[in-house]
Design a protein with these regions (language model features):
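Accessory beta-strand-rich segments of carbohydrate-active enzymes
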Residues: 1-134
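Flexible inter-domain linker/hinge segments
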Residues: 137-163
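Single conserved hydrophobic/aromatic residue that forms the stacking wall/gate
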Residues: 161, 168-169
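A very general structural signal that marks isolated residues within well-ordered alpha-helical segments
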Residues: 12, 166-168
């Protein structure tokens, strides 16, 4: 592997993890403010250091954020909804590349995650014990209490509305 980039966005807010370690932890409330029906920011993260051993789990924690029902007057079309779109692009020394996307593979959903409720005006109800359990699952790749989601069962995030986040160059 010579280069690996994770391109990610969400309707709502998200944290993303590779192999149990958070990617982009210096940014909070990713992807930032945006009306998911008209405009949504995406972020780009270099992730080579997360993929050293060749085996990894990708995980998202998603909350409603700006799209919570209490603050959704300007975002009525996406109120109280969440969704992700991501592309992990790995480039190899021989010139080949591997793309892993949110729309093609099956995803595992853990319906009882650590964020019990969230919103831009509400704040967040967070259960630390559930986070520790989730982090252990992510590090070991063992997803016992899970639901399989196909990529197309996630709320669609349109490519036509994507724009680079103001911190991306």
């Amino acid at each position: 592997m010579v280069r690996a980039r994770l391109y990610a966005t969400a309707i709502g807010t998200y944290q993303v993890f590779l192999g149990g370690r958070e990617v982009g932890s210096e940014y909070h409330m990713k992807p930032g403010y945006g009306d998911g029906a008209r405009s949504i920011s995406s972020q780009t993260f270099p992730v080579e250091q997360f993929l050293k051993d060749g085996r990894f789990t990708i995980a998202f924690l998603i909350g409603t954020g700006w799209h919570d029902k209490d603050g959704a007057d300007k975002m009525a079309e996406t109120a109280n909804q969440t969704g992700i779109k991501m592309l992990l692009r790995i480039e190899y020394a021989d010139g080949t590349r591997q793309d892993i996307t949110s729309g093609e593979q099956d995803w595992v959903a853990v319906p009882d995650g650590p964020v019990e409720k969230s919103g831009i005006y509400y704040g967040e109800d967070y259960h630390q014990g559930k986070y520790i359990s989730l982090k252990n699952m992510l590090q070991t790749g063992s997803m016992e209490d899970r639901t399989i989601l196909s990529g197309d069962s996630l709320i669609p995030v349109s490519y036509t509305h994507l724009r680079a986040h103001e911190t991306d160059s």
